[in-house]
């Protein structure tokens, strides 16, 4: 994990740790000139590691984004941001995306009153995300909400920490994506692969 954040920069979805300010400068001096391929590859890896996806999963999302209307890069980010595990992370119900994925896999999360155990479940506007009524589930979420840094919540989400309930208001706008990334480089990377 630390090698990844040292090489690619801050990845809030993977870990809350940040790279040291001097380490990035050393890497750039040591590596010399970066090729265009390397720049595109690093952007793709940043996206992959932040959202915790395999290469195959990311490729599937790129193909889905390519078929949809609109800018492929923007649609790709919207698809990734509307995943259930990412929404739990952005609501502050989990400290990292892998932590959110574990909550979903262990069946602690309900979407619109139904248990969902698929982390890649695509949330839609007006979805209500809650925890199970069991005490263990509520304690887990309560600990995460209490320890989460209360950064500004994106416009497309609302949380009620007392009821352990989150609401998806709308599809995310690209300016609220929690990662500094040039999504066009990711699309370029895959368009050159085929």
UniProtKB/Swiss-Prot annotation:
GO biological process per UniProt: ribosomal small subunit biogenesis; translation
Keywords (A to Z) from UniProt: Chloroplast, Plastid, Ribonucleoprotein, Ribosomal protein, RNA-binding, rRNA-binding
Keyword Oxidoreductase set for record: no
Keyword Chloroplast: yes
Transmembrane stretches, start-end: none
Main localization of the protein described in the UniProt heading: plastid
Any coiled-coil regions, as ranges: none
Gene Ontology terms: cellular component: chloroplast; small ribosomal subunit
Domain S4 RNA-binding: 82-143
Primary role: One of the primary rRNA binding proteins, it binds directly to 16S rRNA where it nucleates assembly of the body of the 30S subunit. With S5 and S12 plays an important role in translational accuracy.
Subunit structure of this chain's protein: Part of the 30S ribosomal subunit. Contacts protein S5. The interaction surface between S4 and S5 is involved in control of translational fidelity.
PANTHER family xref list: 30S 40S RIBOSOMAL PROTEIN, SMALL RIBOSOMAL SUBUNIT PROTEIN US4M
Protein name, entry field: Small ribosomal subunit protein uS4c
